[in-house]
Amino acid sequence: MTSIKEQAAISRLLSFLQDWDNAGKVARSNILNNFIEANQGKTAPELEQEFSQGASLFLVRLTTWLRLTYMTGSPLDKLLRSIGVFLSAVSSNRYLIEFLEVGGVLTLLEILALNKIKEEDKKESIKLLQVIANSGRKYKELICESYGVRSIAEFLAKSKSEETQEEVQVLLDSLIHGNPKYQNQVYKGLIALLPCASPKAQQLALQTLRTAQSIIGTTHPSIVDCVLKVLCTMHLEVQYEAIELIKDLVNYDVCPALLKGLVALLIPSFKETSKLQSQIVSDSSVLELTAHLPLFLQQAAAAKAIGVLARHNTTLAEEMLHLRVIHSLMAAMGNTDHSNSQRQASLTLEYFVQLFPVVEEHVRKTMGEELYKLFLSNAENLYMNIDSIQADILAANKVNVTRVLHLSGLSYSNMSFYFGHPNEDQVAYVTHFRKEDVEEKE
């Protein structure tokens, strides 16, 4: 027989559940407030004690109400936080299973896609998904099997709250760790985010991609094109993350394509720029676009990235010489439509001139003594001190260091004498470039 104390506790539980069942929206909101305040941070045994071993009876009511109301656009934040009290409690595996058995994951993912639901409510949904993902590998797999990666990535791209977007990043980071079955799916989802219109989403995706890349160890072919396109951004924080990812990617098999792509960006497509320039000429109101053309922003960022890579790894600097990077940098220095392209290209060229005597010789010869002295005196501000004729000389340069490199014997074998022996991966992509040089000459 139950004791008088136990009977009283059961009576209180039944009364509480009856109050919930009979309450309207306002009364239920008050009940949830009191529940969260009284039980936040409690363990599962403590919740059971509070509810006389009947906590699951309240949880099932919460999940049922969630499923009945989430599509109506009703406020969900208190309801989701109350469910979170159960799911985040220590030793709460039973509650978690009960929530998942009634389709909890699918409900949380559907909440992310509904326009009528408030951003704050969606943030609470993301937090519950974090709790589920952090509960173990099989729960991460369940989220991914429920098309969760796509739903979560799309929400990250569309979200207007940076705080919420950062919570989404935490969730994606959790899904990439300890999830070998679906880590490639998360990786591809992050790559798919790069072209999105949200700078914050791009920044967070790039950050998480660096982690994902180190875990997976192989690259997806589309990553090069996607990362290079991000360089057209006007947001420096996004550009920074893109360059940091590029620094990582040169250690993988996409290095040749990445270097070739960066050098190609130094000379934007004439067809694209001519379309934009003709528009500028015909409409004086868009003259300011000259400084913000995506292709020119991309050009400046590429020049900066090339400088970062060259300073980081001398072998990479040499490989870019074989891609005629000096010619392309000087051409970018002649782009009077975009001063930052001139500035970044000039700073990067300065490093190549200091590093390779053969480059110094060709640059001096092409520039002429007067322009070269200006360049040496202040490479960063050269764009402010040159006239239109000097800019044309730079833009129309025909510098080709590649042939001289072969004649002088400057190669990875010579460079290893001064800078140490390259690893096997470096030898592989050096060989790749040598083969292309021979094919071009033939």
UniProtKB/Swiss-Prot annotation:
* InterPro entries (alphabetical): ARM-like, ARM-type_fold, DUF5578
Gene3D superfamilies named in the record? Leucine-rich Repeat Variant
Signal peptide start and end residues: none
Q: Which SUPFAM superfamilies match?
A: ARM repeat
Family matches, as PANTHER family: ARMADILLO-LIKE HELICAL DOMAIN CONTAINING PROTEIN 1
What name does this protein carry? Answer: Armadillo-like helical domain containing protein 1
**Organism this protein belongs to:** Bos taurus (Bovine)
Q: Which gene encodes it?
A: ARMH1
